[in-house]
Amino acid sequence: MRALLVAGVVALALVVLAPASAAKKGGCPAPWNAGWQKLANKVDAPVYCPTWMPNPLDAKIGGDYQDIYSIGKDHSFLVSFLELGDLGSGDVHVNFRGYPGHTAIPRCPAPVGHGKVPCFSEPVGRMSANGIHATVYQVNQGADQWHIALAWHYDRSLYIVSEHVIAPYRFTTQIKRNLGRLLTSLVLVKPAG
């Protein structure tokens, strides 16, 4: 019982506490801006930089928490941030995706058998903040498997942010709360030039 109580307090603290590097609303935080600007320039399309991340993550591309940085030939991108917990304490994992010039949900290899399935499926609601109207998806594939994802359109492009449902954020309500904060925190970074 005591372990469950301690785990609950730790999970609540992780939801409430914002990382020290969270920035004021208005622009991408200075320590993170160069990486997001470089990404926007490489994909030649706007990208969304968060000004808040779930504790303990930051969103510094090239930083300690970056897990994946991938740009496809079609300029689609995946930027992932991950903290692996010690001794079974769980992971904190957030993905940012963009599909410049494409608005359709992409297709992924089927988890069992042959064929393709939507990479994001089973919409369960909507979230709106910061001028963004996102659809909430609960069944996702690839690097977003076991995540809850928000997907929206901007400038004829599809954008997605997702977070893994796992301890310390093991409840969908915690993840949706984090995704709501992320959505509120997003600032648009346009390509230079």
PLM regions with names:
Residues M1-V6:
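Bacterial N-terminal signal peptides that target proteins for export
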Residues A7-V15:
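Bacterial N-terminal signal peptides
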Residues V15-V16, P46:
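Hydrophobic alpha-helical transmembrane segments of integral membrane proteins
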Residues P19-A23:
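Sec/Tat signal peptide C-region and signal peptidase I cleavage site
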Residues K24-K25, R177:
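Polybasic, lysine/arginine-rich low-complexity segments
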Residues K25-S157:
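Short, solvent-exposed recognition patches
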Residues D155-G193:
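Surface-exposed amphipathic alpha-helical segments
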